[in-house]
Each structure stands twice: as structure tokens, then as C-alpha cells.
């Protein structure tokens, strides 16, 4: 499948800002299951590119002059491959063990531990696709998709206790459960063809390391839709949680109020 992607992020400030810096994960990863056919980033200031610790294509946008808004636009076309059972084709140098570490957003709580124990094998840190799909189904039923119920600072434990959240919360609950059993699992940010789900085009899901009879490696799962990843997905970045894989994340100096508008349009071509 080929996906045409247009993603605009617009920040507006009530007073002029003296300085702002934004870390961007807005370029699709170079992986066997997806290929960039064209891609362009438009920013208002100096934007330097680099590869981060997880192998994500990253950019650092810096604005040193007074500004009342920041507009970031990415456009391009990506060719994706239909995967068998959500199995990634990627061969990586990163040790899976770095994705067994809990973060502030994925710290275990008694409720999370109970969920993990109910769905995952009691002994050892190896799981099958069936095991993690069982966990996915339980999270799908326990945490309703409710826009505005949480924010980017909400933890996995808070979302599970509330019983509501969005895609990043579903991902964090899944990661917290896996990490409590020392199972490698990681956060994925990216895009999805909304025609395949009916939800927003900017999305988050998870990769988890499985050991099936005929496969040992990463399987990609969309917890919010209780399904395996297909060719309707474009992968931007991986990380331990939202904070390490967010499409746009930064800070500013200047005070006042901030509003943000995000518009992502993904169309199969």
C-alpha cells in the first residue's frame, strides 16, 4: 500500500516567545516493511537532523527570534508492506533488553500487576503472540477510548484506574504489564489510514518481542483497535514510552498561554 501523508502542527502563543526548541520525530523510520517515496519537512527556523538512541530519524528545531507561533508541516508518500501476523521484518542492533525498563509513565501499580498476572505466563519472560493478544483484548475492554479523558502526563496506572484514555494510554498500559514480567515491549508513534479504523490519523501502538513456534522477533500490535498492525500503518518512531517517541516535544521561554492545533490527513494512493 502507498500512503499519502500530510501532518501539520501549529502552536500559537498569547505573547511573543523569546526562545523555543522542539524535538521532532516526523520522518518515517527506514525499515524493511516501509519505504519512503517522498518526504519533506517545512519549519520556521533552523532544523538540524540526527539519529537518536533508538535509531529514529530526529530533528531539532530552534527559534531564537521573538515569535508568536510555530508551524511545522510534513508531507510525503510512504510505501508499506502487508505483514504476516504483525511480524516485523526488521533486523536491529539494539538489544531488546533496553525495552524491559519501566519509565515514569509505565510504572507498575497493583492493578497493573494484577492485569499482567491474569494474562501473561507466570514464569519466565517469553511470550507467544496468543499471550500478548490476550493481554491486548483485556486492555481493550478495560480502558475505553475516550478523547480528553487523559493528557500527555497521565500514567498507565492512572489510565487503567480511570478506565478511559486514548492510544498512548493503551500503549502505556500494555508496556507496563509486559515490563512487569521482563518482556521486551516498546512504544511506537506514527500514522494510520483512518478509513481502516474510523479513528484519528496520528496514532500510537506497541511492538512486543514474542517467541512463537515458527517465529522469534517483534510483533506490532494496535491495542486501541485490538488488532495486529497491517499495511495501513506508517511508523515514525520507537521508544520506551510517549516521551521518547512523541512526534513533537519541546519547551519555550516567554510565558503566556499556548494553544496547539494538529491536523493529519492520510490517504491511500
Regions found by a protein language model. Give the residues of each.
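Intrinsically disordered, low-complexity N-terminal segments that are enriched in acidic
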Residues: 1-84
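Generic structural "secondary-structure junction" signal
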Residues: 19, 26, 43, 56, ...
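Residues in well-ordered beta-strands of folded domains
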Residues: 25-27, 42-44, 75, 207, ...
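Short, surface-exposed linear segments at secondary-structure transitions and domain or protein termini
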Residues: 47-50, 95-97, 227-236
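Secondary-structure boundary elements
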Residues: 78-80, 94-165, 173, 242, ...
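Short helix/loop capping segments that flank catalytic or ligand/cofactor-binding pockets
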Residues: 82-85, 245-247
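"Short basic amphipathic alpha-helical interaction patches in structured regions
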Residues: 86-93
Amino acid at each position: 500500500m502507498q500512503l499519502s501523508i500530510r501532518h501539520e502542527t501549529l502552536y500559537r502563543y498569547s505573547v511573543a516567545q523569546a526562545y523555543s526548541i522542539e524535538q521532532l520525530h516526523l520522518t518515517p523510520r527506514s525499515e524493511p516493511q516501509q519505504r519512503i517515496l517522498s518526504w519533506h519537512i517545512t519549519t520556521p527556523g533552523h532544523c538540524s537532523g540526527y539519529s537518536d538512541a533508538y535509531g529514529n530519524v530526529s530533528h531539532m528545531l530552534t527559534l531564537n527570534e521573538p515569535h508568536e507561533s510555530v508551524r511545522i508541516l510534513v508531507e510525503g508518500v510512504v510505501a508499506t508492506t502487508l505483514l504476516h501476523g504483525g511480524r516485523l521484518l526488521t533486523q536491529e542492533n539494539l538489544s531488546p533488553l533496553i525495552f524491559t525498563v519501566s519509565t515514569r509513565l509505565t510504572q507498575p501499580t497493583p492493578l497493573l500487576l494484577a492485569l499482567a498476572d491474569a494474562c501473561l505466563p507466570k514464569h519466565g519472560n517469553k511470550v507467544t503472540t496468543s499471550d500478548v493478544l490476550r493481554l491486548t483484548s483485556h486492555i481493550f475492554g478495560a480502558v475505553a477510548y475516550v478523547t480528553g479523558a487523559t493528557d500527555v502526563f497521565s500514567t498507565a496506572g492512572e489510565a487503567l484506574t480511570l478506565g478511559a484514555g486514548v492510544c498512548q494510554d493503551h500503549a502505556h498500559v500494555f508496556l507496563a504489564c509486559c515490563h512487569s514480567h521482563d518482556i521486551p515491549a516498546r512504544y511506537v508513534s506514527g500514522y494510520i489510514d483512518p478509513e481502516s479504523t474510523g479513528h484519528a490519523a496520528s496514532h500510537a501502538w506497541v511492538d512486543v518481542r514474542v517467541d512463537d513456534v515458527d517465529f522469534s522477533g517483534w510483533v506490532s500490535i494496535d491495542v486501541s483497535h485490538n488488532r495486529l498492525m497491517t499495511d495501513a500503518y506508517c511508523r515514525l518512531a520507537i521508544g520506551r514510552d510517549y516521551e521518547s517517541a512523541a512526534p513533537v516535544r519541546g519547551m519555550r521561554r516567554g510565558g503566556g498561554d499556548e494553544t496547539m492545533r494538529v491536523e493529519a490527513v492520510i490517504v491511500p494512493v
